[in-house]
């Protein structure tokens, strides 16, 4: 049985959180590692855009984002444009699923669970 290691990281720049996630993803993929992870943290203002994202969905251009102190990152995750801001709780689950094709149902189930407990 896999164990869930939950870590509260406080305020962490997106770039640092991304490096940590990539390292943990590599670790979780190892057969001998019994741990999955849930990283809980917050970022300063940042916008990310996923592989299927459309930059036309951004309301500000790169100069305007920079003027407002909002970082911008293109990521290899799915999805479109996402904003994270100071004070917003963010959870990054890094979990080895038995069936990698079931990522979307897993995410939907996680979202539903969090909404039931009003998070």
Question: What do these predicted ranges mean?
Answer:
Residues 117-119:
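Conserved small/polar residues in nucleotide/adenosyl-binding loops
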Residues 1-115:
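N-terminal lobe of the biotin/lipoate ligase/transferase fold
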